[in-house]
Amino acid sequence: MLRKKFENTKIILASGSPRRQEFFKNLDLDFEVRLKEIEEIFPKTLQSLEITDYLAKLKASAFDGDLLQNELLVTSDTLVWLQNEALGKPKDYDDAFAMLQKLSNQTHEVITSVCFKTKNKTEIINDITQVTFGKLSDEAIKYYLDNYKPFDKAGSYGIQEWIGLIGITNIHGSYTNVVGLPTEKVYLYLLNHTF
């Protein structure tokens, strides 16, 4: 349904995430991937949703002056929020192990902000999903890290992977948001806005 609406607009997805690219493909969108390296650093005073909003906008600002009139840029950022602490992508194996130990037997929030930028305007949408892990043994965490290497994922896990299948006991909200993009909200935004 969106293909016709965007036949004269070039959608640019600024994400190296294979999961986000697959979602865009499955939404039947014609898009191009363009990447720019930015340092994902945020002011320590920011909390929760403020962090992902800030980082999604920061990623979009890297394209200031580069967009043509008929181009729509999409950037996003996802993080795990647990007890007033942001868990982004792990620095290394030990950091990933520690994150999963913290998530064990706890409910956390997965927060994603998506920024839509054209030559003339920037808008942002976001989503929050609550996810509960049961008790994860150190042996299960080690097995997961050794075999799935989730070092490119916020919170050091993929809900669609082994650890999600054996460890997640409850989810309240958007499943696709936990994977990395709230597709339902993205689709409705694209459907209902003019670019």
From Swiss-Prot:
Site feature location: Important for substrate specificity: 19, 78, 160
Active site, per annotation: 77
Pfam families the UniProt entry points to: Maf
Cofactor (UniProt): a divalent metal cation
Subcellular location, record wording: Cytoplasm
Matches recorded under CDD domains: Maf
Transmembrane segments: none
Record field: catalytic activity: dTTP + H2O = dTMP + diphosphate + H(+); UTP + H2O = UMP + diphosphate + H(+)
Primary location recorded for the protein, binned into one broad class: cytoplasm
Highest taxon in the source lineage: Bacteria
GO MF term set: dTTP diphosphatase activity; UTP diphosphatase activity
NCBIfam families recorded: maf
Family classification: Belongs to the Maf family. YhdE subfamily.
HAMAP family documented for this protein: Maf
Protein name: dTTP/UTP pyrophosphatase
Species of provenance: Flavobacterium psychrophilum (strain ATCC 49511 / DSM 21280 / CIP 103535 / JIP02/86)
